[in-house]
Amino acid sequence: MKLGLMAGDIVAAAELRDLGFEAVQMFFHGGANGDSGDPKPADIDAVLNAGNTALAAMTLHADLVGPQGAIQADIERTIRCVKKTAALKGRFGANPKPVLVWHPSGYPDAPQVDDRAVFEGLCQALTPICAAATELDVQIAVEITRAGSVGSAETFLHLKDRIGSPALGVCLDAANFVPDRTPLERAVRALGPHTVIAHGKDSCFRDNGEVDTYGPIGSGRLDYDTYIKCLLAHTPVPYFVFEYYKTRDDLLRARDTVRAAMGAASVLSQR
């Protein structure tokens, strides 16, 4: 499992390899009408070449569903991003195929939300998206997040059963839904065969059990020794991508925490 990070300027590109980071994750512009804001292949190449890094994944933030079901404009936008991701083939390093992370926006919020329609809308939206991904040899990775329309391991597995596409996988960021939605070890074990990429950040909780804040690895309560051990044991992910760091020191502390957990897991596996 190689280390990556979100594209940005916290660390100079020329330092990335020396600091142990081999890939960056980049973003399409969010929303249904974001095409004009998307990076061009030349823009992406400039970032990758500056750090001699691979592209861990492209990312799209989009709703796909509203209170009454699927949003056609978001579906069409996501399919366009699938095509743009496919056009970046050859840049994705250790990934067996191009990866598009879909990050759901917040769970539809309205006085008359039809929860069944939300789930059916997800199925309606993801079916043509996955068909396009299959045709173009792209892997879709759904980022499970407690505030979004795919909020637990169980919800993803229900979607996977309904859609039945090998193109539908998971972006596993445990801080997004553990332990209040799905317990940590169960989450990684259940999602392991479907996990395409993993993320690293941390989360703190209020007394009532709701999430309070997100931050860099080490700033919250996630058990990183267990998280990394389970990722190595149960998933085939090529890249573990760091996020929510605000400073260079944040990032390097997070890197050292993950490296230590990887070392401990390696020792355990040899016993």
Residue spans of the language-model regions?
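Histidine/acidic residue-rich metal-binding segments in metalloenzymes
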Residues: 123-131
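Structural motif corresponding to the early beta-alpha repeats
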Residues: 22, 26-121, 176, 237-239
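Hydrophobic alpha-helical segments and helix-packing faces
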Residues: 119-122, 149-153, 184
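Histidine-acidic metal/acid-base catalytic patches
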Residues: 2, 9-20, 51, 74-84, ...
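Structural detector of well-ordered beta-strand residues that form the stable sheet scaffold
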Residues: 4, 56, 100-101, 141, ...
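A generic structural signal for short
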Residues: 1-2, 32-33, 69-70, 117-118, ...
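Basic- and aromatic-lined ligand-binding clefts that recognize polyanionic substrates
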Residues: 135-163
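Active-site beta-loop-alpha junctions enriched in small/polar residues
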Residues: 6-10, 27-31, 60-63, 105-107, ...
